[in-house]
Swiss-Prot record:
The lineage of its organism: Bacteria, Pseudomonadati, Pseudomonadota, Gammaproteobacteria, Enterobacterales. Keywords: Antioxidant, Cytoplasm, Disulfide bond, Oxidoreductase, Peroxidase, Redox-active center. The keyword Cytoplasm applies. One of its GO terms (molecular function) is NADH-dependent peroxiredoxin activity. Gene3D superfamilies: Glutaredoxin. Thiol-specific peroxidase that catalyzes the reduction of hydrogen peroxide and organic hydroperoxides to water and alcohols, respectively. Plays a role in cell protection against oxidative stress by detoxifying peroxides. Belongs to the peroxiredoxin family. AhpC/Prx1 subfamily. This is Alkyl hydroperoxide reductase C. Homodimer; disulfide-linked, upon oxidation. 5 homodimers assemble to form a ring-like decamer. Its EC number is 1.11.1.26. GO terms for biological process: cell redox homeostasis; cellular response to stress; hydrogen peroxide catabolic process; response to oxidative stress.
Length: 199
């Protein structure tokens, strides 16, 4: 299901905070509070690709904070399993601690509302949603279970969104932070094509 351009479905569920506290009624809308956010799903704790993704997101967390972006993760595990997994990752020396909120989707209602439930296994596919300050989904990626996602690409898309919001210029192929955009006029596209033809 493609949700880009649509409002992000709201939800209230149990969660583990970045401090490891259990939140019984975590509300997505209240937590994001008109900030850009990344909502990402993984299948289950204590599996194989999932730890690599959680660690990768956690290692880059300062880059999300620098961009004023809230990071929220979701799986079908209970808050108690989330808590145990956090401790296991930490005790194994892989990370100090997980510093973002982990939501429990025990009833699978959240993953279904985002249309990313695996049709046979009932777990979430590896989905990532970039949601703007008006709670509109601007970008989404969905990977099958064997394939971990690229955190650098997630950050690049955040930069692209913020660039567009600030300057009103669109971002061409392979755009990255520091590059110029394209003004949405005939003159703008002409200048861009002229520029790349000289490379």
């Amino acid at each position: 299901m493609v949700l880009v351009t649509y409002p992000a479905p709201d939800f209230t569920a149990s969660a583990i905070s970045c401090n490891g506290d259990i939140i019984n009624n975590f509300n997505f809308k209240e937590f994001t509070n008109n900030q850009t956010s990344i909502l990402f799903f993984w299948p289950m704790d204590f599996t194989f690709v999932c730890p690599s993704e959680i660690i990768a997101f956690n290692q880059e967390l300062s880059k999300f904070k620098k961009r004023n972006v809230k990071l929220i993760g979701v799986s079908i595990d209970s808050v108690y399993v989330h808590h145990a997994w956090r401790n296991t990752l930490s005790h194994n020396g892989q990370i100090d601690k997980i510093n973002f909120t982990m939501v429990s989707d025990l009833k699978r209602e959240i993953q279904r509302s985002y249309g990313i439930e695996h049709p046979q296994l009932g777990v979430a596919l590896r989905a990532t949603f970039l949601i703007d300050k008006n709670r509109i989904i601007r970008h989404q990626t969905i990977n099958d279970l064997p394939f971990g996602r690229n955190i650098s690409e997630t950050l690049r898309m955040i930069d692209a969104l913020h660039f567009y919001e600030k300057y009103g210029e669109v971002c061409p192929a392979n755009w990255k932070k520091g590059d110029t955009g394209i003004k949405t006029t005939q003159e703008g596209i002409h200048k861009y094509l002229e520029k790349i033809s000289k490379k």
